[in-house]
Amino acid sequence: MDRVLSRADKERLLELLKLPRQLWGDFGRMQQAYKQQSLLLHPDKGGSHALMQELNSLWGTFKTEVYNLRMNLGGTGFQVRRLHADGWNLSTKDTFGDRYYQRFCRMPLTCLVNVKYSSCSCILCLLRKQHRELKDKCDARCLVLGECFCLECYMQWFGTPTRDVLNLYADFIASMPIDWLDLDVHSVYNPRLSP
């Protein structure tokens, strides 16, 4: 996500969101901060019109560029539908509802051990499969979070693995707009129908 905004714009967005630099790319936390700051900066609530306009502009650019970064890799072709930018409020967790964590990782031991050869259709395994396909297609490593949302790229971006890495990763993916993941949501819902 380093390529999404210029360094100055990135720092300005984080400053307006009142977030530390290490949270750059954590979409869920950035979105929460955006909502909080929007309430504080809104002109009707006594905030600054200029700051609100700047925040909206930077936030809109950030979201659009992350989406473009992901889709300009060619995508995997799995996605059944695309939402307009206004529909990006539909998070992955909203899409799968109460069963999100069950659909995120169906068989934790199997999914975590069979990194390269899993035929599982949980979100974790599908994102890993995308990683392999995208890297074969592009013939390059993932250097930027946003190109890939697999567990390994998440750990590389946010630091070394910990005991709670799977929970942190599940929460990270939960807040992502479902379109950004480029998943066939039908195969996640209905694993018996997936190829």
From Swiss-Prot:
Q: Where are the zinc fingers (H1C3-type)?
A: 131-153
Transcription regulation as a keyword of this entry, yes or no, is yes
Q: Which residues carry this modification: N-acetylmethionine?
A: 1
Q: Which domain of life is it from?
A: Viruses
InterPro entries according to UniProt: DnaJ_domain, J_dom_sf, Papo_T_antigen, Papo_T_antigensf
Ranges of residues in domain J: 12-75
Question: Does the entry annotate any disulfide bonds, and if so which pairs?
Answer: none
Pfam families tied to this protein: Papo_T_antigen
Q: Which stretches are zinc fingers (C4-type)?
A: 111-125
In its UniProt record, a GO molecular function of this protein is: zinc ion binding
Write the record's keywords in alphabetical order, separated by commas: Acetylation, Activator, Early protein, Host cytoplasm, Host nucleus, Host-virus interaction, Metal-binding, Oncogene, Phosphoprotein, Transcription, Transcription regulation, Zinc, Zinc-finger
UniProt free text on domains = The common region of ST and LT proteins comprises the J domain. This domain is essential for multiple viral activities, including virion assembly, viral DNA replication, transformation and transcriptional activation. This domain is also required for cyclin A-transactivating activity of ST.
Q: What does this protein do?
A: Promotes efficient viral genome replication by accelerating both G1 and S phase progression of the cell cycle. Inhibits host PP2A by binding to the A subunit, thereby displacing lower affinity regulatory B subunit. Inactivation of PP2A in turn results in the transactivation of cyclin A and cyclin D1 promoters. Late during the infection cycle, ST may induce dephosphorylation of host MTOR, leading to the inhibition of cap-dependent translation. May establish and maintain high levels of viral genomes during persistent infection in cell culture.
Q: How does it assemble?
A: Interacts with host PPP2R1A; the interaction inhibits PP2A activity.
Q: Name it.
A: Small t antigen
Q: Which organism is it from?
A: Murine polyomavirus (strain A2)
The beginning of the lineage is: Viruses, Monodnaviria, Shotokuvirae, Cossaviricota, Papovaviricetes
